[in-house]
Regions:
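Residues that mark the N-terminal boundary/hinge immediately upstream of a DNA-recognition element
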Residues: 18, 43-46, 57
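A short, Lys/Arg-rich alpha-helix, primarily the initiator
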Residues: 1-20
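Short, charged recognition helix plus adjacent turn
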Residues: 2, 11, 62-71
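Residue-level detection of the helix-turn-helix DNA-binding "recognition helix"
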Residues: 13, 27, 38, 66
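The alpha-helix within a helix-turn-helix
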Residues: 12, 23, 51
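Short alpha-helical DNA-recognition segment
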Residues: 16-34
């Protein structure tokens, strides 16, 4: 199972918000932002804070990618 956060980065662009703005607004640690950039697993409570900050749902910020798929 792979997760990617491409939808998060696109949503930030749509909202004219930088990753640093999100980090401050959602109280996200720098190492968690690195995990997001690397498409690594992030704890659900953190994803919940991101969703609440952006007024989004989990599916708006991340997607499950099948192994071997490109994307």
């Amino acid at each position: 199972m792979r997760i990617n956060y491409n939808r998060l980065w696109k949503l930030l662009i749509d909202k004219k918000m930088s990753a640093a703005d999100l980090r401050r607004a959602a109280a996200i640690a720098p190492n968690t932002m690195t995990k997001l950039r690397r498409d690594e697993v992030v704890a659900l409570p953190i994803l919940d804070r991101i969703c609440e900050t952006l007024g989004a749902d989990y599916g708006d910020i991340m997607e499950h990618v099948k192994e071997g798929s490109v994307g």
